[in-house]
Amino acid sequence: MFVIACKFNPVFPFIFELVAGIRLFHPDEKIVVVDSDSDDKSYLGILREKHGVITEDIANKNWMIGAYWYVYKKCPDEDFYYFMHDSMKVKANLDYLREKDLTLLMTFERGIGGYNGWAEAINNETDYDYTKSGQGCYGPIFFCKNKVMKKMLDMGADKFMPVTKQDSHYGERAYGVFLEAQGYDLLKCSLYGDVLEEERPTGRSGKYPHNTSWQYPVEKIYASLVDKKRL
């Protein structure tokens, strides 16, 4: 199952290219799009009629993490989940990722940047220690077997919901904590390695405004560079 959080802007309708790519390489796979309280929701009908997408018009205000948990709790028995942003492209079949428990798009050192605002709450409200050393889950964008999400639910990860852009940065780091606590080496689980390294002038994405066309078989576009509503 593909699970996509979408804040639709008709000027930059990234979701259409993403869903078309998924359907090209996964014609029979379930696709669920969760609307994040978009002003224009006309796209939902287009996705249903043209691509057979399951749409959830729930006025989601909890960013990507809110969309992921909404779908997981509604559909808890899927074997595998591809958790994505709408500003992505699928360029090939992704079935091979099902062979692994967990694949992250990219990582980064979670101690960098100071976005550790959920640390105290996680330490107080779960049985797990939030450490600033380790990897964050960029996005968070990840693809995983059911057991990974079931364990995160058992860990209490669903208690922590972003409501602001800053909170979404906290979530990237928190999910690094929860996934590492399950025993996963996130660097080894990552498709493309460290996002900050790739954003350097010598990295594959290069310096601002960053070119991600090299990413294959799935690409994350820096949508906020063109769609200022995402800032």
Residue ranges and their predicted role:
Residues 1-231:
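ER/Golgi luminal nucleotide-sugar-dependent glycosyltransferases, focusing on the catalytic module
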